[in-house]
């Protein structure tokens, strides 16, 4: 546990906290809770995915951890406090070793680490001194929770009920602004994830052939990721033939047929930092003339969208650029007429038959990472770039996607060493010999 969390080093997490507390109002404290361990069936539980804000600020992944930041506290020892689970020999027998206080300090750089059982008393004394409280919540625009209150929401409800006369603020806006701009250490973690994704894709490209099942392709990715200390960044999409027209197809149980394409939206995560990749490759190792025609159109759209990425660009304007580029390609392919393009309403009804999603999203500790959607892009943002064309009547969906860093001078692909052009894909797949005759 400690080795994974400490990969960035305590100085990075200390820097993150310094930037966040600088934006708090005077006499304010902020509280961040880890995520719940969620049940499955019977006595089973899901693997804990740490609260990304807590990890960003501390590097600690362990369940039930709480961070309190109070930069204006009268006593210096109260300005940063990390609460971790109480030591339990019985728990160690069943679940293994948990963090000691010294290990939590080594990972996070926080000098004062306390047992969770002491939280209520210490927090009450801090609240007697504080005037404003920053509470955290998942404010991602597409977040949807049906299982009841999250740990953060339960804490917020209880805190407001017990201390109704305090002022309360939203921590999420500060966290989203800070997390959007990646530090050099964070970018290096994402580069490592991209490198592992590259190695896995190269392995898979030489493995795919007619008769292979989508689940076997998933297993090849899993072997490469897990063997090298990574994991899937998200549930993999391995979609052969018409399955590629379902945007988030995850059954991954169909057989790849000769002459079809298979869309691979699969990427690695390392030390909680994610990458995101999509390639669409020919099952038989060679594109048909029609497949190549459409593939190259998507590739040109990718290049145009990639070149448009730069500081100052706003997400909604980037989407407009993508829509205009893809509309032109669809007209050139004979799939739309100029009259259909011109007569569309604001909902882009004609375009949406073939391209119906955004052109990219922020990525980092979350795959669909936090960002302020109306904010201009800045150097240090890491985005995906993923135009596509889906043609249901031809049983074909082609999407191309890289993880891309925004710099002062424009976009830099962190996956530039992963083949994307149609000829490069065919060359990579042919390295195992002529198997398509």
Predicted regions mapped to residue ranges:
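Active-site neighborhoods and metal-handling regions in enzymes and metal-associated proteins
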Residues: 1-437
């Amino acid at each position: 546990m400690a080795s994974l969390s400490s990969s960035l080093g305590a100085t990075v997490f200390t820097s993150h906290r310094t930037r966040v507390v600088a934006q708090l109002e005077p006499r304010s404290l902020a509280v961040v809770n880890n995520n719940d361990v969620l049940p499955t069936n019977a006595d089973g539980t899901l693997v804990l995915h740490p609260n990304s804000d807590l990890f960003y600020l501390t590097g600690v992944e362990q369940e039930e951890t709480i961070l309190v930041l109070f930069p204006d506290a009268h006593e210096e020892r109260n300005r940063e406090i990390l609460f971790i689970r109480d030591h339990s020999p019985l728990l160690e027998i069943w679940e293994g070793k948990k963090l000691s206080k010294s290990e939590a300090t080594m990972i996070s750089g926080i000098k004062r680490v306390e047992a969770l059982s002491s939280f209520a008393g210490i927090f009450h004394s801090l609240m007697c001194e504080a005037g404003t409280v920053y509470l955290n919540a998942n404010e991602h625009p597409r977040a949807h929770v049906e299982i009841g209150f999250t740990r953060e929401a339960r804490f917020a409800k209880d805190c407001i009920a017990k201390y109704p006369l305090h002022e309360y603020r939203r921590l999420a806006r500060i966290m989203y602004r800070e997390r959007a701009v990646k530090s050099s250490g964070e970018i290096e973690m994402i580069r490592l994830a991209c490198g592992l994704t590259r190695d896995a894709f190269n392995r898979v490209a030489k493995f795919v052939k007619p008769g292979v099942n989508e689940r076997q392709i998933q297993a090849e990715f899993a072997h490469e990721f897990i063997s090298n200390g990574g994991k899937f960044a998200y549930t993999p999409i391995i979609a052969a033939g018409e399955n590629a027209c379902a945007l988030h197809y995850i059954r991954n149980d169909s057989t790849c047929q000769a002459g079809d394409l298979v869309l691979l939206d699969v990427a690695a995560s390392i030390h909680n930092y994610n990458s995101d990749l999509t390639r669409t490759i020919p099952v038989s190792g060679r594109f048909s003339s029609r497949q190549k025609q459409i593939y190259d159109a998507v590739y040109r759209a990718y290049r145009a969208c990639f070149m448009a990425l730069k500081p100052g660009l706003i997400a909604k304007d980037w989407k407009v650029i993508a829509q205009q580029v893809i509309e032109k390609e669809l007209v050139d392919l004979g799939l739309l007429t100029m009259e259909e393009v011109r007569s569309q309403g604001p909902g882009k009804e004609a375009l949406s038959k073939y391209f119906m999603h955004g052109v990219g999203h922020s990525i980092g500790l979350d795959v669909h990472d936090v960002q302020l959607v109306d904010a201009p892009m800045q150097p240090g943002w890491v985005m995906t770039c993923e135009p596509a064309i889906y043609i249901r009547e031809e049983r074909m969906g082609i999407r191309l996607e890289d993880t891309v860093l925004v710099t002062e001078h424009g976009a830099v692909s962190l996956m530039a060493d992963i083949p994307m052009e149609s000829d490069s894909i065919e060359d990579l797949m042919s390295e195992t010999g002529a198997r398509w005759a």
